[in-house]
Swiss-Prot record:
Cysteine pairings via disulfide bonds: 24-45, 27-32, 38-63, 67-78, 79-84
Functional description taken from the UniProt entry: Three-finger toxin that binds and inhibits the muscular nicotinic acetylcholine receptor (nAChR). The neuromuscular block is irreversible in chick biventer cervicis, but partially reversible in the rat diaphragm preparation.
Protein name in the entry: Three-finger toxin W-V
InterPro entries: Snake_3FTx, Snake_toxin-like_sf, Snake_toxin_con_site, Toxin_cobra-type
Keywords: Acetylcholine receptor inhibiting toxin, Disulfide bond, Ion channel impairing toxin, Neurotoxin, Postsynaptic neurotoxin, Secreted, Signal, Toxin
Subcellular location: Secreted
GO molecular function: acetylcholine receptor inhibitor activity; ion channel regulator activity; toxin activity
Tissue-by-tissue expression: Expressed by the venom gland.
Primary localization: secreted
A cellular component annotation (GO) from this entry: extracellular region
């Protein structure tokens, strides 16, 4: 009986995803609901807002390992919770 219980515990541990995987929004629009599971090592969600270009306002969302620096006429927001880059 102990062997069966130990086997069940081991199978459960192997089958569970013990690591936490961040999910972020990834669409290039102002309002977004497309969710993406970030890769291992990507622990931040980012949202980049480009202002004043010829195409109007543009958004870029996704996952990142580090928070990028904003370039001129750009706003960058980084966060570390699921879907926090809305």
């Amino acid at each position: 009986m102990k062997t069966l219980l130990l086997t069940l515990v081991l199978v459960t541990i192997v089958c569970l995803d013990l690591g936490y995987t961040l999910t972020c929004l990834i669409c290039p629009k102002k309002y977004c609901n497309q969710v993406h599971t970030c890769r291992n090592g990507e622990n931040l969600c980012i949202k980049t807002f480009y202002e004043g270009n010829l195409l109007g306002k543009q958004f870029k969302r996704g996952c990142a390992a580090t928070c990028p620096e904003a370039r001129p006429r750009e706003i960058v927001e980084c966060c570390s919770r699921d879907k926090c880059n809305h």
